[in-house]
């Protein structure tokens, strides 16, 4: 329980969280920022989220007790990389933030232009900000021609960030290690988290197995995320199709439900397998229903800071089949809690899916174990308390 002094301090604090992407955009950073903001607000702080206006919404409003300030921007790469403008509206919004006299500033993710502006804003206000890392590998567009350019830009923008004083944290141990690639030392982790019971309770009444005509004895595997190269979703679909074409004599059929949208949807559709079910981007309630009903969640991703879907599946006692990306060290530390595969090649994923189909009892045990762990160690209240402690430490006089 928080002491009286801690409660008083939290209730008097003004905190600004910067995140280039925020709802209604969907993604791990967006969910992290929203959840941390809500947890800090519930602890009594006055919280503002400063973001880029990628969807043409109001420049300023209050959502569920949290102030939201949206800067005008140019939404490049389909909105994934917004460039903050410096027009008259932007200047008015910066002046508004300056008038709030924030005690603490937290910036999410390197390399966005809003992040650089956030670090400059904090420095001019006399605040040492936290910079939270959300990745564990370079950004990728899935192109051998474009990716080297993207990496060079990422390094250049990170160097610009490093001109300012900040204290770096990360959402997982792998993300902390990745900061070292840029010559940045991590002070520790402020992990991605989930309010597990609340997540499960919000599930809708949709029955995905019935909707898609999936037999009750089939292994139902869920994937949730952007359909882009780095998520490994095409390889996952190829693995599912290979099992459908050459089923095990004693194994269950494997059906894959893919929730999400993105550039690789056409590639998945062209595989032409009846055991692959594309259901589009799902709302939170429907996604919780899918995770609760699935026998396993697959995430053969190239890079994750600490995948939100990993936490969502764990909350639902659904074990993961996942590559060793950020968050697996903590949540899926060994095969008692899920299945770690060494790479995202289709044949590797296929072998893991076949093994899962042959061992339903092991899947159930993994699900029970990871559900207990996520409830014991990964609540948003706990991460918010760590964030406050980190802010205080960074700004000790």
Where are these regions (language model features)?
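Carbohydrate-associated surface elements
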Residues: 53, 174, 193
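Nucleotide-activated donor-binding/catalytic signature segment of Leloir-type glycosyltransferases, i.e.
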Residues: 266-285
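Short hydrophobic beta-strand element within catalytic cores of glycosyltransferases
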Residues: 319-322
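Conserved acidic donor-binding segment of nucleotide-sugar-dependent glycosyltransferases
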Residues: 334-335, 339-346, 355-360
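Aromatic "clamp/platform" in nucleotide-sugar-dependent glycosyltransferases that forms part
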Residues: 302
């Amino acid at each position: 329980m928080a002491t009286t002094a801690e409660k008083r301090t939290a209730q008097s604090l003004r905190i600004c969280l910067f995140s280039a992407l925020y709802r209604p955009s969907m993604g791990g950073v967006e969910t992290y920022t929203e959840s941390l903001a809500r947890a800090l607000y519930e602890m009594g702080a006055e919280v503002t989220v400063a973001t880029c206006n990628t969807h043409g919404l109001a420049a300023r409003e209050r959502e569920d007790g949290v102030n939201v300030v949206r800067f005008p921007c140019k939404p490049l790469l389909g909105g994934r990389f917004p460039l903050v403008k410096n027009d008259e509206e932007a200047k008015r919004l910066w002046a508004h933030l300056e008038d709030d006299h924030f005690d603490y500033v937290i910036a999410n993710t390197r390399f966005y232009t809003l992040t650089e502006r956030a670090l400059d804003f904090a420095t001019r206000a006399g605040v040492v900000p936290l910079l939270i890392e959300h990745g564990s590998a370079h950004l990728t567009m899935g192109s051998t021609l474009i990716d080297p350019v993207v990496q060079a830009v990422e390094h250049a923008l990170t160097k610009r960030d490093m001109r300012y004083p900040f204290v770096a944290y990360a959402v997982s141990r792998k993300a902390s290690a990745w900061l070292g690639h840029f010559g940045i030392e991590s002070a520790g982790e402020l992990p991605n988290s989930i309010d597990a019971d609340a997540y499960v309770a919000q599930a809708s009444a949709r029955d995905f197995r019935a909707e898609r005509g999936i037999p009750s004895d089939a292994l139902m595997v869920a994937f949730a995320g952007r359909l882009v190269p780095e998520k490994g979703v095409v390889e996952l679909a190829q693995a599912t199709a290979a099992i459908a074409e050459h089923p095990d004599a004693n194994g269950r059929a494997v059906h894959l439900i893919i929730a999400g949208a993105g550039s690789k949807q056409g590639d998945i559709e062209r595989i032409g397998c009846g055991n692959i079910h594309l259901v589009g981007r799902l709302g939170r309630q429907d996604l919780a229903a899918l995770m609760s009903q699935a026998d396993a969640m697959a995430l053969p991703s190239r890079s994750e800071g600490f995948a939100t879907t990993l936490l969502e599946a764990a909350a639902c006692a659904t074990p993961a089949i996942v590559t060793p990306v950020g968050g697996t060290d903590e949540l899926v530390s060994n095969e008692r809690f899920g299945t770690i595969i060494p790479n995202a090649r289709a044949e590797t994923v296929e072998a893991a899916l076949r093994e899962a189909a042959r061992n339903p009892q092991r899947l159930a045990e993994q699900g029970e174990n990871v559900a207990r762990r996520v409830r014991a160690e990964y609540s948003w209240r706990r991460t918010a308390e760590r964030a406050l402690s980190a802010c205080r430490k960074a700004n000790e006089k």
